Amino acid sequence: MRWVQRTSLVTQIAIAVVIGIVLAAVWPAATPHLAILGSLFISALKAVAPVLVFVLVMSAISNHTPGETTHIRPVLVLYAVGTLAAATVGVVASMWFPSTLTLQAPAQAAAGPGSVSEVLMNVLKSVVENPVKALLEANYIGILAWAIALGLALRHASAGTRAMLQDGAAAVTQVIQLVIRLAPLGILGLVASTFAEAGAQALWGYAQLLAVLLGCMLFVALVVNPLIVYVAIRRNPYPLVLMCLRESGVTAFFTRSSAANIPINLALAKRLRLNEDTYSIAIPLGATINMAGAAITISVLSLAAANTLGIQVDLPTALLLCVVASLCACGASGVAGGSLLLIPLACSLFGIGNDVAMQVVAIGFIIGILQDSAETALNSSTDVIFTAAACLAQERKAQV
């Protein structure tokens, strides 16, 4: 027990990853039992995250001091710039290193959105969702909308009511901290079950495609994002970027859920001493609309399909794909199947039929063991990186 208290959470997670891989290799029969740990951990995170976001945002807004600014707009600008930059990286990399896919007979099509307007309409409908249904289904746009509305209304409540909201937020935060302490056990189960079920064999056939996807995500995480952060804070961005990748990206990689990683990001933002009025809104919102990894996935797989079919993509169409991929990525959390089911929408730019596009989606699910994990790690870590950058930029301006 003392060792657990002395050792950092990141170190414990790293040890859990190694143990999980070893167990999957030498004792695969035990992995179904270990998988229970992973599923329980993800379920616990997903269960507490909607309540945490609702209570925390409502408490932060109702107790907001008049005259203080929340700096949400700079965070949203960083989210938009980061997502568009990621889509551009995906397009450029696909043109420099074109990938091909093995496409067979038409696959059974799943129901994906038909147009960009449909994706945006789904997002708008989420805003006016029934609040109870929004909490039950973890619709974070709806949760944020109701939390903001109730928080604004409760600004005029008595001091005792607002203090009760603060106490409620503190209580939920304590529950979250308990769940986060169990992360090493959960990740041990996730790693063991993932490696035992899929292994590395299923990925070799798509080695180049995976290399392009993961290379783009690494480039965005280690080059593009630090550059954006540097422009915002005007000092070395790497201490902040690497800390967020280590503290947020590692857990997101294994949970494969931006929503489940919201509590981890909120705890990290608190440790960084960011403005609570800013991060309590910006991080849950980022889990919904800040999707750099999804933009890369959509652009790379769409261009791989076009290249396989011999379709020549000109510069204007490539630029349009960057914009479409960015818009689609922002709506990815509102579509079952996330970024993969938005690929047919992007493929429609090249005149690729839905039957072929859904085969590309199927390939995406095959490589999802790495693609989805890396995508989520980039998405979720970028939420807290850009939120911190916006807060630090405002502090720098205030000191000038």
UniProtKB/Swiss-Prot annotation:
This is Serine/threonine transporter SstT. Belongs to the dicarboxylate/amino acid:cation symporter (DAACS) (TC 2.A.23) family. Coiled coil: none annotated. Gene3D superfamilies: Sodium:dicarboxylate symporter. One of its GO terms (molecular function) is neutral L-amino acid:sodium symporter activity. It is found in: Cell inner membrane. Its main location: membrane. The chain crosses the membrane at residues 9-29, 36-56, 75-95, 134-154, 175-195, 209-229, 281-301, 323-343, 349-369. Keywords: Amino-acid transport, Cell inner membrane, Cell membrane, Membrane, Symport, Transmembrane, Transmembrane helix, Transport. InterPro entries: Na-dicarboxylate_symporter (IPR001991), Na:dicarbo_symporter_sf (IPR036458), Ser_Thr_transp_SstT (IPR023025). It is a multi-pass membrane protein. One of its GO terms (biological process) is threonine transport. HAMAP family: Ser_Thr_transp_SstT. Involved in the import of serine and threonine into the cell, with the concomitant import of sodium (symport system). It catalyses: L-serine(in) + Na(+)(in) = L-serine(out) + Na(+)(out); L-threonine(in) + Na(+)(in) = L-threonine(out) + Na(+)(out). GO terms for cellular component: plasma membrane.
